[in-house]
Structure formats: structure tokens, C-alpha cells
Amino acid sequence: MKTAYRPQTTSETMARIAAGVDPWIAYRDFLEDWTYLPESRRDLVAARPPWTRREHERWASLLAATVEVLCAREDLPVPAWTSDPRYRLAEPWYLYAGTGRMREWLRESTPGPFAERNIWSGDRLLRRT
């Protein structure tokens, strides 16, 4: 019996993170499905990714920023859940270690949807999507 592949939605991405999967692996799996399954894109981002534990707030916010950027690139409607203020971090999150020039580069090159959520990623996070 053949099992059909089910693409990983934003909601399922957060569920995997909550279950203990390395967050970067879950995030990359979501990005791969976005990249290689264009016919599924609207379904991938339709549901708001819930979180209950404080340490998962960063990942939910990262997903919101990611969805906003990816939908804008593809001229798809951005889901309303991405504008929920709960997806904005109170404290800055720098995705790369470093201070001084590194942080300066991150602040200058991070796309708006990430910066608006206080996530400083630089401009390379989504380069393969």
C-alpha cells in the first residue's frame, strides 16, 4: 500500500517543534515543501501556527515573517494571522552570533517582515526558496 506524501503546514511545523524536533529541521522541511510543491502553497500557510510554550514564540514569529515574505514573492494573499501582534518579539533575536559589525549587517540587510518582528536574520535566510 502506497502512502501519499502530506506537505508540512505552518501548523504542523510548530507541532513538530513542540514535539522536540530540532526547530531548524522542521523549518527547513516547511521551506522545502513551499519550494517544491507550488500547488500546495496556499494550504501550507492557511492555518495559524499555535504555540503554548514561551520558548516556541520565536519560531512562531519566524514562521509568520517567512510566510509574509514568501507570499509577497509569489503574489499570493498574505494570511491574516501573520499580522497578529503575538507574532512580534519583545526582545531582539539575532539568528547569527556576533556583535558589532555582524549585528550592523543583520540590521541593514534583514527584510522588513523579519525586522518588524524583531528578528534579525540578514538577507540570506530564504535565498534557496
Show the residue positions of the predicted features.
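Charge-dense, extended regions
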Residues: 70-129
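Charged, helix-prone or intrinsically disordered regulatory segments positioned adjacent to compact structured domains
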Residues: 2-77
